[in-house]
């Protein structure tokens, strides 16, 4: 039974290996030879008193039948919940990220012109115990981790790539309206009105707001992966800014 923090570390290396080689190859295909691509195994500190630990809500792993879920719960003391009518999955805590442990190294690499893959899977969740970092049984939300990373690197824009070109209010209804350019205040209003689904667009919009309001001039962009270029050019996507 591998600890969840170790599973995150393994997935960072596994996925990072493929991603960095794909990026390296694409750079070379474009005759760009002076940029190094590197994956940083990234630990992210969480608060052991975060309320999320008392209310696990993040589904992980494969879908199971009720009988399989009961067996896993008894065998490993997992918390299992029904998910979207497709079966049962394990749920774990999803605490807010507080500190990126390797931020100094990441910043040095970025400042030197390297292309850095960091905070994979939201980061390896750890709790500080004196000088020791203890792995936590949790999964950190990737959008919040990205917002924290962007703030720490003093980025101008946070780009959140997802499965749709723009965020929308009244999604999936006849009143559906795509959002192009909105202020932080408008985004907070839409969040309060419940327009964004938990576990889907809601954390993306919350992370976008968190970054956009963190300093003057910062903006967040939510768009489709295939439309990233057009989004950066201001031609599509949902852009969130302070005023």
Feature-to-residue mapping (PLM):
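C-terminal catalytic "cap/lid" subdomain
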Residues: 1-243
């Amino acid at each position: 039974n591998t600890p969840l923090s170790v599973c995150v570390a393994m997935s960072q290396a596994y996925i990072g290996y493929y991603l960095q080689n794909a990026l390296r190859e694409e750079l070379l295909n474009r005759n760009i030879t002076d940029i190094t691509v590197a994956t940083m195994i990234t630990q992210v500190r969480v608060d052991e008193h975060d309320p999320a630990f008392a209310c696990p809500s993040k589904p992980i792993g494969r879908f199971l039948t009720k009988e399989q879920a009961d067996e896993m719960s008894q065998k490993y003391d997992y918390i299992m919940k029904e998910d979207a009518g497709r079966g049962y999955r394990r749920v774990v805590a999803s605490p807010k990220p507080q500190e990126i442990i390797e931020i100094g190294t990441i910043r040095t690499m970025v400042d030197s012109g390297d292309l850095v893959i960091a905070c994979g899977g939201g980061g390896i969740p750890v709790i500080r115990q004196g000088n020791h970092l203890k792995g936590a049984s949790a999964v950190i939300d990737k959008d919040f981790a990205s917002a924290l990373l962007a703030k720490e690197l003093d980025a101008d824009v946070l780009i959140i790539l997802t499965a749709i070109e723009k965020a929308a209010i009244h999604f999936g209804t006849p009143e559906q309206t795509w959002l192009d350019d909105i202020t932080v205040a408008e985004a907070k209003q839409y969040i309060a009105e419940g327009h964004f689904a938990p576990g889907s667009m809601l954390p993306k919009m919350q992370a976008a707001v968190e970054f956009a309001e963190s300093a003057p001039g910062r903006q967040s962009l939510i768009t489709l992966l295939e439309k990233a270029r057009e989004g950066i050019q201001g031609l599509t996507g949902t852009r969130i800014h302070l005023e």
